[in-house]
UniProtKB/Swiss-Prot annotation:
One of its GO terms (biological process) is receptor-mediated endocytosis of virus by host cell. The lineage of its organism: Viruses, Riboviria, Orthornavirae, Negarnaviricota, Polyploviricotina. This is Pre-glycoprotein polyprotein GP complex. GO terms for molecular function: metal ion binding. Signal peptide: none annotated. Zn(2+) 2 binds at residues 476, 478, 484. It comes from Latino mammarenavirus (isolate Rat/Bolivia/MARU 1924/1965) (LATV). InterPro entries: Arena_glycoprot, Arena_glycoprot_zinc-bd. Glycans are attached at residues 90, 112, 127, 180, 248, 386, 394, 416. Belongs to the arenaviridae GPC protein family. A lipid is attached at residue 2 (N-myristoyl glycine). Pfam families: Arena_glycoprot. The keyword DNA damage does not apply.
Length: 515
């Protein structure tokens, strides 16, 4: 009795403590729920948007829960340092810088005024791109670049059956070569078409003035429903300028060079001379892991080769796709990197046959079709790949990557991510599919086949018995109007063999077992 009285006396204190706990719980729940409501209302997102509006966008954003859109930019400064590079200031002034850290270059100018006095000049014919010393003096440094430039303009004009019209040059002014672009009866029109096409190949898409009348056919609307792509054929060269002048100049950072033209140099026949002389400088890329160890399980671009990314690694799954099809610009770059190890070892044997083998191998590593396709896309003012920036989808949870795709360029700038949104969403879905497929195959490999069969048949048995359970079968007979006769078992006549139910003829019915 005393314990009961003591309990009732302490009840107010217990109630006060319980009430305090309840108040704390209610306050916490209300605060948390209020924060969730603010987040779902979009107020915080609006403040973030207003704060960041107008600022530069990051090229790394989330797609779904674990996938991120990222990019890597390759630094070609060291990769192409030994080869000539080109750039354009405007439609009339174009520059070609010499290899390495040279201070000289070649200036290509389109003008309507001649710089050479015809009476004091000598005429040089088809052998100008073989022996330029007949035209100018003291150009040992410029000779390689000049040969490449002329070879590209003439489109391998030295082949049998090809002829070029004469050009003008003047020794007294150093390196000075002048082309007369005026169409005359003396100048074969096919030759000028080839020269103008070579200029378009060198100078890029912004110089579409090189092409006049074209037969346009097979026009189709693109997937973005904003552009129409047409196949052009039988284009005739055309330009409003009368003269093309090539002369030497000092290099003062005239403009930003385009290394896509330099890659064309490496792929061209005249470029083999550069590769032969500078092979060791050309193959200076390395493969390593994040700690600098040689050749890891996957591919890593070292810090000097990547802009703003430090060391960037890609897993073996993404790289294995490069062995399936030769249709990726990123894979072409990796083939050059991977070739580095054996090439440097082979350079210990300096025989001419070995060098020829190496140069031919380099030429086969990069896809000619891809390179030409991107150059043609540039000429037609269609977004093209310049082999510099590549985008990919990164799974932040598992560290998996998609095969990097080239970030296309249009009008001198990279496309906005929204222009190829369908592509990176498709890549994200493909990465999910690959991961699920690999996980399924991995689980299949760890599971015995007999266990799978047992699981299948047991599941089938369970489903069958489930229907039987729902339907139910009658288990015994009842006398209509009377109680359960169990444990006696009645016959169809309503009697039991033990004699307890001995009067036959009573009506019976089947009854299910009680559950």
């Amino acid at each position: 009795m005393g314990q009961v009285i003591g309990f009732f006396q302490s009840l107010p204190e217990i109630i006060n403590e319980a009430l305090n706990i309840a108040l704390i719980c209610v306050a916490l729940l209300a605060t948390i729920k209020g924060m969730v409501n603010i987040w779902k209302s979009g107020l915080i997102q609006l403040l973030f948007f207003l704060t960041l509006a107008g600022r530069s966008c990051s090229h790394s954003f989330t797609i779904g829960r674990f996938h991120e859109f990222q990019s890597v930019t390759v630094n070609f400064t060291q990769f192409m340092s030994y080869a000539p590079s080109s750039c354009s200031v405007n439609n009339t002034h174009h520059y070609f810088k010499g290899p390495q850290n040279t201070t000289w270059g070649l200036e290509l100018t389109l003008t309507n005024e001649s710089m050479i006095n015809i009476t004091n000049s000598m005429r040089v014919f088809t052998n100008i791109h073989h022996n330029v010393t007949n035209c100018v003096q003291n150009i040992s440094e410029h000779e390689g670049v000049l040969k490449w430039l002329l070879e590209t303009m003439h489109l391998s004009i030295s082949k049998p059956g090809k002829h070029i019209a004469p050009v003008m040059c003047e020794r007294q002014k150093g390196l000075l070569i002048e082309y007369n672009l005026t169409m005359t009866k003396d100048h074969h029109p096919n030759y000028w078409n080839q020269v103008l096409y070579g200029l378009a190949k060198l100078l890029g898409s912004s110089k579409r003035l090189w092409f006049g009348a074209c037969n346009k056919a097979d026009c189709q609307m693109q997937s973005d429903h904003q552009h129409i792509k047409c196949n052009y054929s039988n284009c005739k060269g055309y330009t409003s300028f009368k003269y093309l002048i090539i002369q030497n100049t000092t290099w003062e950072n005239h403009c930003e060079y385009n290394h896509l033209n330099t890659i064309h140099l490496l792929m061209s026949p005249i470029g083999q001379s550069f590769i032969t002389r500078r092979l060791q400088a050309f193959l200076t890329w390395t493969l390593s892991d994040a700690l600098g160890n040689d050749l890891p399980g996957g591919y890593c671009l070292e810090q000097w080769a990547v802009v703003w990314f430090g060391i960037k690694c890609f897993d073996n799954t993404a790289m294995a796709k490069c062995n399936q099809n030769h249709d990726s610009e990123f894979c072409d770059m990796l083939r050059l990197f991977d070739y580095n190890r054996n090439a440097i070892q082979s350079l210990n044997d300096q025989s001419q046959a070995r060098l020829n083998l190496l140069t031919n191998t380099i030429n086969s590593l990069v896809s000619d079709n891809l390179l030409m396709k991107n150059k043609l896309r540039e000429l037609m003012n269609v977004p093209y790949c310049n082999y510099t920036r590549f985008w990919f989808i990164n799974d932040t949870k598992n560290g998996r990557h998609t095969l990097p795709q080239c970030w296309l360029v249009s009008d001198g700038s990279y496309l906005n991510e929204t222009r190829f949104r369908t592509q990176w969403l498709s890549e994200s879905n493909s990465l999910y599919t690959e991961m699920l497929t690999e996980e399924y195959e991995k689980r299949q490999g760890r599971t015995p086949l007999s266990l799978v069969d047992l699981c299948f048949w047991s599941t089938l048995f369970y489903i069958s018995t489930l229907f039987a359970h729902l339907v139910g079968f009658p288990t015994h007979r009842h006398l209509i109007g009377e109680g359960c006769p169990k444990p006696h078992r009645l016959t169809g006549s309503g009697i039991c063999s033990c004699g307890h139910y001995g009067i036959p003829g009573k009506p019976v019915r089947w009854t299910k077992m009680s559950r």
